[in-house]
Amino acid sequence: MKKHHLRHALLVLSAAILLAVSCSFSAASASASPPASEKKIAVWEAAILGVVEGITEYLPISSTGHLILASHALGMTQFSETRGPLGTLMVKNDAMDSYNIVIQLGAILAVLGLYRKRVKQMLKGLSGALAVLVSRRSVTALGDSERQGLKLLGLLLLAFLPAAVFGKLFHEVIETYLFGPLPVVYALVAGGVLMIGVEYFFWLKDRNRLRISDVNSMFYRQALFIGMMQVVSMWPGTSRSMITMIAGLIVGLDMIAAAEFSFLLALPTLGAATLYSGYKNWHALDDSAGMLALAVGLAVSWLTAVIAVKALVRWLTHHGLIPFGVYRILLAGVLLIYFWQWR
């Protein structure tokens, strides 16, 4: 996997969004278009959303911001007549929201496959710990690999906990007041500036600092800090991968370890969101998408996520996050221009 593959992935993403935007103009000229809440997702639309989800979920550029743009361009979401404290909001569409969350399963499966050795290590550690408890033996009976796997599992669960609690308490508030163009634009710009600043001050200017290169060598306080920072990503447009990667750099991980922990942390975080949303809105999801569209979205999301993760790791080995920060700021400008015409 070479660095030009990341450029190819971004070109595919741009093409998918441009196709969606062009469809929005043709749909706008058609008078018989159904309301977004009644629109059934076509297979080709599912493929576009799968590309957008798969590429943007792990790149630090905000999957939510891209999905809001693509969903609206495809006529699947609409603006509300009411305004929130940060401007116009999107009409709540449980089926569409659930579809965007459920196709995250493709991205989850991508990380499960790419980091299967880490996953096996954690499962081995968990099974070893359970065996020790059942047999009432000492924890010292665990092997080195089992102890490392158990520790990594503990690090991930600790980092996942803040988002789980905050999400349960404030999920409705976030959906009610923050799912709109301006909150996403603010988050894209703030995240872009933050990414550029953190890389400059915590990475480029601190090259000689001894950093952790193996996630198994992390301390629990570092995992907790990353988890607390992950809460910020619940603001639409922030990017979960962006905020967790820069949090990793701040606490002393090197670039690759920060990315790896971010990818692994996606397993419980995205997994919980996918299961909850799929269970809660399954009937609406089945009515609006259908099994074929859902399967296509999942498959495309998985394939593009595999490509994106491999390309990102290769890119970060030789480059950094600053180009993504610049991209976020440019994307914010595109979103402002696009949504201004629909005001």
From Swiss-Prot:
Subcellular location: Cell inner membrane
Membrane topology label: Multi-pass membrane protein
Additional comment: Bacitracin is thought to be involved in the inhibition of peptidoglycan synthesis by sequestering undecaprenyl diphosphate, thereby reducing the pool of lipid carrier available.
Organism: Syntrophus aciditrophicus (strain SB)
GO biological process entries: cell wall organization; peptidoglycan biosynthetic process; regulation of cell shape; response to antibiotic
Designated gene of the protein: uppP
Enzyme class, UniProt record, top EC level: hydrolase
InterPro entries xref list: UppP
TM region(s), chain numbering: 9-29, 95-115, 150-170, 178-198, 245-265, 289-309, 320-340
Any Gene Ontology CC annotation: plasma membrane
Name of this chain's protein: Undecaprenyl-diphosphatase
Task of the protein: Catalyzes the dephosphorylation of undecaprenyl diphosphate (UPP). Confers resistance to bacitracin.
EC number(s) given by UniProt: 3.6.1.27
Reactions catalysed, as given in the entry: di-trans,octa-cis-undecaprenyl diphosphate + H2O = di-trans,octa-cis-undecaprenyl phosphate + phosphate + H(+)
